[in-house]
């Protein structure tokens, strides 16, 4: 079950990051959005029922492939960068590390704080909030305005993580807060 949940949330993170990344294109968008939807529709059953639901497992494999094709061309974001460090330093499965970071990274990315970081024409203005809202719309997540849709998307992701046994904090995975803080500078420099 742990492998199913960790790899399933990793698939979702691949797809969401590929969709909102500045190198996303019309070609990668369809793959990413379909993969996100497939994860929401199939991961809980693949997790709960395992081999007893081969269709859900097949759909998760397909979602993984589509998300992979999306991020191979659109690339990934800071969540994956940080998850690699967090997982390596604190011996957490990669998908779990992504799961622990994704909604906080999304909240940061959707804010006005990220500044223009490149010469890509797609990034003349930050657009991540709008892209996250498009994800919410595609998943049928409602809200009175874009900010509420975004918050509801975050809540849906948190609910999905809970359904598949992902704990809420790094500390719940046995990482001591003092040790985490002591290794933070070294993690960022690597």
Can you describe what each PLM-predicted range is?
Residues 30-34, 38, 59-62, 81-84, ...:
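Amphipathic alpha-helical interaction segments
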Residues 34, 77, 158-165, 183-186:
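Short acidic alpha-helix initiation/capping motifs at coil-to-helix transition points
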Residues 176-190:
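Short, amphipathic C-terminal "tail helix"
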Residues 92-179:
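Gly/Pro-rich interdomain helix-loop hinge
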């Amino acid at each position: 079950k742990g492998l199913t949940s960790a790899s399933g949330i990793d698939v979702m993170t691949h797809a969401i990051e590929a969709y909102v990344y500045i190198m996303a294109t019309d070609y990668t968008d369809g793959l990413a959005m379909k993969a996100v939807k497939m994860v929401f529709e199939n991961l809980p059953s693949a997790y709960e029922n395992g081999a007893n639901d081969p269709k859900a497992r097949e759909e998760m494999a397909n979602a993984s492939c589509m998300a992979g094709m999306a991020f191979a061309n659109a690339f990934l974001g800071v969540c994956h960068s940080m998850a690699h460090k967090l997982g390596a330093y604190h011996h957490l499965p990669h998908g779990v590390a992504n799961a622990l970071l994704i909604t906080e990274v999304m909240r940061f990315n959707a804010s006005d704080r990220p500044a223009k970081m490149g010469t890509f024409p797609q990034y003349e203005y930050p657009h991540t909030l709008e892209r996250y809202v498009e994800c919410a719309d595609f998943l049928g997540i409602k809200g009175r305005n874009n900010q509420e849709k975004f918050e509801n998307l975050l809540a849906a992701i948190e609910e999905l993580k809970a359904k598949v046994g992902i704990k809420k904090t790094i500390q719940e995975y046995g990482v001591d807060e003092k040790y985490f803080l002591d290794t933070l500078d070294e993690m960022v420099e690597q």
